[in-house]
Amino acid sequence: HLIHDAYNANPLSVAEALKTLVELSGSSRRIVVFGDMLELGDHSAAYHEEIGRQIGASKIYALFLKGDLARITASAAESAGLDRNHIFFFDGKGTAIPALREVVSKGDWILLKGSRKMHLDELIPDIRLFGG
């Protein structure tokens, strides 16, 4: 199952997308593919840290991150309970797809969320081929 919400991203829309993922997925595994939220100004790092905490608290199985603030998000997610071995970084389709293919299983719920300039939509055709 794939939730594609990677056209625009801000702290509120990410929080709502996570809430939707949790509600729809039930007891299935949850995977988040998250690209940076852009154009947030001076508070950008703090917003990414808060989103990381929310991700970590949402019982996510795996987190895939793209962007300059990915390490901040990852650190906060790990501090909030996400296993560091289930956090992955990618810089484009070439590195994301092989890693996702290793992790994603049939029945998993995948949320793609990030600003449009992160180009997460480029991952959709491949994700659909192997289970999303």
State what each model feature region is.
Residues 1-132:
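ATP-dependent carboxylate-amine ligase
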